[in-house]
Amino acid sequence: MINTNMKYWSWMGAFSLSMLFWAELLWIITH
């Protein structure tokens, strides 16, 4: 259970970081 929970949170963290990265990159390109 702990292993599954850690995988879930690490995946969420990686996903949110990548989304922030792409949002920042698009902002720089479009502005």
Swiss-Prot record:
The record's induction entry says:
Expressed during stationary phase (at protein level).
Q: Which GO terms describe its cellular component?
A: plasma membrane
Which InterPro entries is this protein grouped with? Answer: YmiC-like
Name one matching Pfam family: YmiC
TM annotation in the entry: 9-29
Which terms are listed as keywords in the entry? Cell inner membrane, Cell membrane, Membrane, Transmembrane, Transmembrane helix
Q: How does it sit in the membrane?
A: Single-pass membrane protein
Q: What is its main location?
A: membrane
Annotated localization: Cell inner membrane
The organism's place on the tree of life at top rank? Bacteria
Against NCBIfam families, the record matches this protein to:
membrane_YmiC (NF041484)
Know the name of this protein?
Protein YmiC
Name its species: Escherichia coli (strain K12)
